[in-house]
Every structure is written in structure tokens, then in C-alpha cells.
Amino acid sequence: MIFSSIAFVAAETEAAKAALARLEQRYPHVDPGEADVIIALGGDGFMLETLHRFVDRRVPIYGMNRGSVGFLMNVYREHGLIERLSKAEEVILHPLRMKARTASGEEVEALAINEVSLLRETRQAAKLRIRIDGKIRMDELICDGILLSTPAGSTAYNLSAHGPIIPLGAGIAALTPISAFRPRRWRGALLPHTAKVVFEILEAGKRPVSAVADYTEARDVVEVEVREDRTCDLVMLFDPEHNLEERIITEQFLP
């Protein structure tokens, strides 16, 4: 791939801002709104922020790690950037779209690149009913919470909650409970990526629940619908020797 106009964006850390200054001195660059590729300098959190920021542009984003976690980032090097971009492999992600309805009647809609999670707000456990494509699959789940993860997000919160790591292109999503009390032995499910999942919050007044799509939170929800948004393409670029598919496989063999 040959790119004619590059933009740089950076997290608000000293390391990221210092890298930004050096790279902008070294390479011709334009404003992000005019670029045909964006270089994101930071960690995974900043990469998610950048993907959300430019979601309507479908501009490829190439991350370089200047943060603490860099699963979604390439190795930081200042030299040879143009050549690296020309050899980079493209990964297209489709985010989840969350539609949440709160107790006050407010409708909250947001995209999630990693996962949509439902979490109890108080000492009371959450009590949920789960519908998949209109059919009740679990009439009552008592838990601290539950999440629906994309393949790209399966190594994040999902993995910490003991959910499965999913290869890119598998065409599935992970439904993973968080500290399930009843049914105690339920460990979640793998769903087709086309599935529409609806969570109904039972006893919502007594057991308040929040819903979070990446970093957009809705409090006191009573119903949450989640499904993949195939109309939204998020384009990421990775070095061939360390692409996202390879990282997901490697993550499964870490000690």
C-alpha cells in the first residue's frame, strides 16, 4: 500500500508526545482530516480512542506503541516508517453496536471495538435474562456481570474473565459471564457474529446494572441490545511479521 498523506496523533503521555515531535520533524505530515493514513502513538487505550474518533472516515490506522499495553500496536521505531506502511497488512474490524435503555427511559447508543459489558452497580448481584435472536436462552443468570466480546477484544477483559480467545475471521463472538453465581457451572457461549443479543435486567430497581461499550457507560439500564454493525469498517495496519492474527495465536501459548 502506498500512502500519499500521513497524519500523526498521540496520547497525552510524555513518551507519546516526545515521539510525536520527533516523527513530525522527520516526515511530511497533514492534519488527520486530510490524511489517507493515521499513525497513532500510545497504548491500546489510545488506539481504541483513535478508532472511535475516526470511525466515520474509514481511514487506515497504524499504531506504534508508546504506552504500557501494546497488543493492538506495532513496535515503535522512528526510521523506515514509509517502507513499513507500504508492507503493512490490513485488518478490517466490525464493531459491536450497543443500544441500551435506562430506567428513566433514556436511549444510549454506542460502538464497541473490544466488548460490551454489563456490571452490577452495588453489592447486590445482577440478575439477567438473555435472549439470542429473539429466543430466551437463559431465563435467569445471577452474576457480577456479563460481556459480549469481538475476536479483537477477546484477549482483553474477556480473557481476564476466563473467556476464550477467538481468532480473527472465525465469525463468532464470545458471551462470557463475570463471576456467575447461578447457574454456577455456566462458563458462557460462542455465538455467530450475526447474533442479536438482548439482556433484560431483572429486578432492576433492587439490582441496578450499568452497560459499557468500550468506554461509553450507561447507568441503571433495564434492557441492552448488542449486535455486530456490518456497516461500519474499522481498518488497522500491522507489520507482516507481527500481525494481529499472529498475536492472538501467540497469546494462547503464553506461560
From Swiss-Prot:
Gene3D superfamilies: Probable inorganic polyphosphate/atp-NAD kinase, domain 1, Probable inorganic polyphosphate/atp-NAD kinase, domain 2. Its EC number is 2.7.1.23. Pfam families: NAD_kinase, NAD_kinase_C. Keywords: ATP-binding, Cytoplasm, Kinase, NAD, NADP, Nucleotide-binding, Transferase. It catalyses: NAD(+) + ATP = ADP + NADP(+) + H(+). It comes from the Bacteria. The keyword S-adenosyl-L-methionine does not apply. InterPro entries: ATP-NAD_kinase_N (IPR017438), ATP-NAD_kinase_PpnK-typ_C (IPR017437), NAD/diacylglycerol_kinase_sf (IPR016064), NADK (IPR002504). NAD(+) binds at residues 44-45, 114-115, 144, 152, 155-160. One of its GO terms (biological process) is NAD metabolic process. SUPFAM superfamilies: NAD kinase/diacylglycerol kinase-like (SSF111331). The active site is at 44 (proton acceptor). Its cofactor is a divalent metal cation. GO terms for molecular function: ATP binding; metal ion binding; NAD binding; NAD+ kinase activity. It is found in: Cytoplasm. One of its GO terms (cellular component) is cytoplasm. Involved in the regulation of the intracellular balance of NAD and NADP, and is a key enzyme in the biosynthesis of NADP. Catalyzes specifically the phosphorylation on 2'-hydroxyl of the adenosine moiety of NAD to yield NADP. Belongs to the NAD kinase family. This is NAD kinase. It comes from Paramagnetospirillum magneticum (strain ATCC 700264 / AMB-1). The gene is nadK.
